[in-house]
């Protein structure tokens, strides 16, 4: 598997990552055992970048990835880079969603993701969607605080045009 350099402190990461969203919802029924086997096979093939979000499966996706990390111990964690996202808030049983980028939500979402993933630090923490009503400086400031506190190694934005 080809590798890419991930920033000055991020080491190497596989050029191909595995998006885990479908392991929890959106593309039909999911099977936890099959999902765990898929994650294991991806690692065997040299994939080291795994992408999830707090909204996928209402937290189930992060819990699944956290279980996989825990079952593999420190050696597995050392070889994986975890990317997760915040900002899309959904209620169970409803299709509607809202976007929350408030600094309070950014911090709370990060803590919840760390807990579900069983991590002390998220490698890549993304703002999933932007709410233009929240000043960009506030969003970036909250994310920078998480990096400074060691809760995220890197932060950025996903699918934002404003």
Task: Show where each model-derived region lies.
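Glycine/proline-rich, positively charged
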Residues: 93-162
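Generic beta-strand or strand-like secondary-structure segments
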Residues: 64-68, 81, 85, 105-112, ...
